[in-house]
Amino acid sequence: MERIVIALAIINIVKGDQICIGYHANNSTEQVDTIMEKNVTVTHAQDILEKEHNGKLCSLKGVRPLILKDCSVAGWLLGNPMCDEFLNVPEWSYIVEKDNPVNGLCYPGDFNDYEELKHLMSSTNHFEKIQIIPRNSWSTHDASSGVSSACPYNGRSSFFRNVVWLIKKNNAYPTIKRTYNNTNVEDLLILWGIHHPNDAAEQTKLYQNSNTYVSVGTSTLNQRSIPEIATRPKVNGQSGRMEFFWTILRPNDAISFESNGNFIAPEYAYKIVKKGDSAIMKSELEYGNCDTKCQTPVGAINSSMPFHNVHPLTIGECPKYVKSDKLVLATGLRNVPQRETRGLFGAIAGFIEGGWQGMVDGWYGYHHSNEQGSGYAADKESTQKAIDGITNKVNSIIDKMNTQFEAVGKEFNNLERRIENLNKKMEDGFLDVWTYNAELLVLMENERTLDFHDSNVKNLYDKVRLQLRDNAKELGNGCFEFYHKCDNECMESVRNGTYDYPQYSEESRLNREEIDGVKLESMGTYQILSIYSTVASSLALAIMVAGLSFWMCSNGSLQCRICI
């Protein structure tokens, strides 16, 4: 009877009022990496790496791109007859050129400093074409016969629209001396060229003079070109070649031309009426009737994320390109769902063995159990502080990294391959550094966030422990067991920090002494039972061994000899 009373007393002790400190858990499968661990499941996370694009060319902040279709930049600026739709173009946000446009220099040749011109256009948003030397002003030269079958239009020979190929007139080619003064307030882009005939006969046929030159001068330019007559293979049916040049004429500056043959004269020039961020982007896409803040050659990105892995070349206000496949910031806690089959207290409660899916209105909080029932209650103050802190941190990271960032392709000619290779290696190096920095940033911040949550739970636990002191027992799993009755009002006082320790200290002391006495008595009883059980077991074993030996001796299976 005494042992039954002891057992009931122990059961009664186990079922005392309890309060546990724990944290939120949910069904999330989001995983993050930290400095110390990989694939940590968390309750909440935020992806900061954009991986999607729309596969279209879009307007940039409401301004359409200039999509050159099958025309090159050279074909557009010189006026290839197949590019007539681009003779006058509105303002553009960026220029799109195919990798290998078919309508470029229809008459074979070269565009001097072409890559530098493309670089210049990365800071231009609008040209206004103006006439600087009218075609009909060449009274002593033939300004209409300079056409070629290499530049056809409607089945007939034609030529670049914006320059004039001057031919001899009446078997004479008088020396040209022309000057144009830039009275505009804007810079002017001026283009001209020189023709290199196939042989001396062609030279005389076209220009009459055999020793010719083209001289061009401004306040900053002094250039003299001489035709190079040579036999060449035919390109587009032509053995001759043309070489084109360009310069920027500043306001109040003048450009002078002098030539006695082979001159490709400018008729139109381009007034640079608007400068700004632009680019020449290589892409085969068509316009998608859309708007974006960030464009890549493979499609537009509409994202507020600080990083992307869509394409290394961009134009606009873009995230930074990194080579990473995953950049996820932890914003919630470690997600360790409770083990429902093991009961609530002592197995799943607290921050040691698992979180609570039943607590949905906060990150940290309490679970209590008393005679009035049980329930969850979030600690909203600590939760809100944590949410504010993490939100501010994430926003700060995004604001710092999500600045306008453009990475446009650089142009190199055939003689600059070593420079191009070096540039690619440098850019790859920068991308590697950016990628490493981004990944390290995420790993460190995730480690700090999870440590921050662990610290907040521990602080909440310490807050309760300091209030209860010896009025309750720590169960070692995030729970406290009261030595006194604690109704719902008492539980609320623990949660809000107003628990009255003296009010319950006497009751706790008496119950604690009673429990300690019961434990001592039960310990003595169990010790006696343990000794009795050990002696009885040993005696029974000895009797069994003796009986077995006697039986084996009697049937001859075991020989027994007693020597004196």
From Swiss-Prot:
It is found in: Virion membrane; Host apical cell membrane. It comes from the Viruses. Residues 549-564 are cytoplasmic. One of its GO terms (cellular component) is membrane. Disulfide bonds join 20-479, 58-290, 71-83, 106-151, 294-318, 486-490. Residues 1-16 form the signal peptide. A lipid is attached at residues 553, 560, 563 (S-palmitoyl cysteine). GO terms for molecular function: host cell surface receptor binding. The record marks 342-343 as: Cleavage. The keyword GTP-binding does not apply. Palmitoylated. Residues 17-527 are extracellular. Keywords: Clathrin- and caveolin-independent endocytosis of virus by host, Clathrin-mediated endocytosis of virus by host, Disulfide bond, Fusion of virus membrane with host endosomal membrane, Fusion of virus membrane with host membrane, Glycoprotein, Hemagglutinin, Host cell membrane, Host membrane, Host-virus interaction, Lipoprotein, Membrane, Palmitate, Signal, Transmembrane, Transmembrane helix, Viral attachment to host cell, Viral envelope protein, Viral penetration into host cytoplasm, Virion, Virus endocytosis by host, Virus entry into host cell. One of its GO terms (biological process) is clathrin-dependent endocytosis of virus by host cell. The chain crosses the membrane at residues 528-548. Major glycoprotein, comprises over 80% of the envelope proteins present in virus particle. Binds to sialic acid-containing receptors on the cell surface, bringing about the attachment of the virus particle to the cell. This attachment induces virion internalization of about two third of the virus particles through clathrin-dependent endocytosis and about one third through a clathrin- and caveolin-independent pathway. Plays a major role in the determination of host range restriction and virulence. Class I viral fusion protein. Belongs to the influenza viruses hemagglutinin family. This is Hemagglutinin. It comes from Influenza A virus (strain A/Mallard/Ohio/556/1987 H5N9).
